[in-house]
Amino acid sequence: MITQNSIPEVKEDFIGYALNERRIRLPQFRDLGPADLITLAKYLPTSSNTNAINSTGGNSGAITHAPAADGSAASMVTNGDTSDAAITTNSTAASIYSNSRSANDAAPMVAELHPLNKLKGEVGTFFYSMGVDTSGPTSIAIFLKEISEIITEKPQVWFGKKKTFNVARISFSTWNAFRRCDINVIVHIPGTIQNFIVDCNGESQNIEMRADHDLIWAETFVSGVVRSIMLMKENAEEGELQNLVETLILNPFTAGKIDDVPEMFIDLFPIIYHKGPSLGAPYYIANVTNTNNYLVETLVEIVKLTRSVNRAEIMLKNLATENPEAIIILIKIFLVCDLEIDAIKLTYDMLSQGEKTINTNNHMGYRSELLCLQAQFLIDKRQDYALGQNIAQEAVNCSPSEFRPWYILSKVYVKLNDIENALLILNSCPMSPLKEKYVLKRVAPLHSNNSLHLPLPIDVVLDEVTSLNPQDVQKEHRSADPMLVNLAASNLKSTFQLAYRLLTEIVQITGWENLLKYRSNIFVMEDEYQNSSSSLSKGVNEQEEQPLRAKRLCERWLDNLFMLLYEDLKVYTLWQTEQLYMDAQNNNHNKLTFEWELFGLCARRLGHFPEAAKAFQNGLSQRFSSRCARKLLEYCINERQRVKIFINSPNSHDMVPEMVSSRIRELDNSIIDLCVKICCWNHRWYTEFSISLLDSLSVVIQDMGLTKVSNEISSRYPETVLKLVQENLLDFFKNVCTNGCYDA
């Protein structure tokens, strides 16, 4: 649901600023690269402007070559807010259009925008985007035309003043992560359409003149889809938050202008398969392989969401005739789609045939992947920890430099209550401190917040969500309890975040005092080790040093996690004690929503999920908080799954069926409410796509059906809210998932 008020914009210092900044930074882009960039040149319609535009307009819709190196006369167009000043001036300080320009100039990026005519009130703006269909120049041009029509359809509230803008030019830049080059499409209105490549050296070339132009567009399309999916998946723990506020995030599954996006991605996968490692891999993977990279992660996520298992299975089995390791991807898909019998059978077949199946240089790496999948299944689904331990140990032997096998082995020792071995294995995990999750980063720096145009989407109003004042929230953040705000464990990243989660599972079993005893029994601290070394050099009796020699040196990062755990436990205990006292006195808890949020996150990190959920509920009872809502939604989904599992357990006869039904109904209502509110909040901040919301709502839809869920929302919320949820969530299940998994 894109409207004028749902498009964030940044005012440029001069027209072409954002494109030029992007061109300068092309050599710095790594792996998946930046978000797509959209730039606009807007002007105030006057008779002189209209004549100027018409006199330079070309053949509308024609496809032209890349900007030539011998362009037209030099001019610089700078931004202006006033409606009564023509502000085009000649200069060489900014966006240059010169007869003697080289490929490295800004001109090829800016592409001579009516250089000989002064347009009144002209202003350059830009914003970032994700999820746009980049399968070809036509689909991009259709999207750009939609954006320009939205901008010009009615007067725009521009920094407090209503202005009627026309769009002279609109451009789209997207990163082809496989070739490390930028793909540009520029639409002149009225006039021509240009599409060209700009490589890391600043050289530009027309795409259509290349023999491999179809492959280039296929790579560009896949790059865009992978970015959209991985942005959400990699930041799921952080609530899919991203700090680049001037970004319009669309649903890549429903943004297709010509073809079905999920089907197209699956069909193109074999063509791009061998290039997958060039995209990089999640933060916990050290050695990127054909089956362990962002491309594969995206395919698995797409099939899981759309339930396109049959199409993916046919494609992967065909691919496996020449690339046997591709079966590993199919096993991953079977596991996430609850086809566990098929997955385990395939895993067994591949492991039993060994090198006959996978005859590659990375045989041990692929074997380790299979063993990890098998061990994870035994731990999570079968609770066969003894067998899981043997398999995880074999996975470590196959890939000793990978984090995941060590992590699984440590996890299975925790399940076996073998705390000493769990800690020793955790201490041995190969950490990756420099590898980060995929996040969006600003390509064109903001020189001032005054250049940000962040309209409030007024097409959807849900008072408790959309009326929230960001300044009030910031004030609340500043006055929150410093003890909660400064908890360093909340800032843990990458593999350290996973290691901390294991440590909290251990302390739940042992308690803090016993954990310290385990630590002192098996580890020697770094300062203790240094002191013992100096003692030996001074001739201290070696027999006194024997106990130290039997211990392992505790890694500094693990020692730091112990300290962070102590801080979390201390704060949690203090807050719990205070709450119990207040409850006993029948007094109200005088806490801020932000404080409830921080306490809930602390409790969640420590594995106290019911207490965390209660804290999030307390916070939401005072005002809306997107983080509280997301974490409470996660709890409701997990609690619903727990109840479902309990129904099928031998102890289920102790629970009255009516009680089970009532609990499931209560959780379903909470899930629907939270999904709707988070969807409205996302729309407020220009985000129309969320994997976590699709995942959460799918659980309810599978039981209730699409029509009933839609009716539930319709009965509780205004029509505009229903329309938003329909477009952003429900239409996905209706139009994209057409294989009967989600009945109406």
Predicted regions and their residues:
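Non-TPR docking regions that flank or precede TPR/alpha-solenoid scaffolds in eukaryotic proteins
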Residues: 1-744
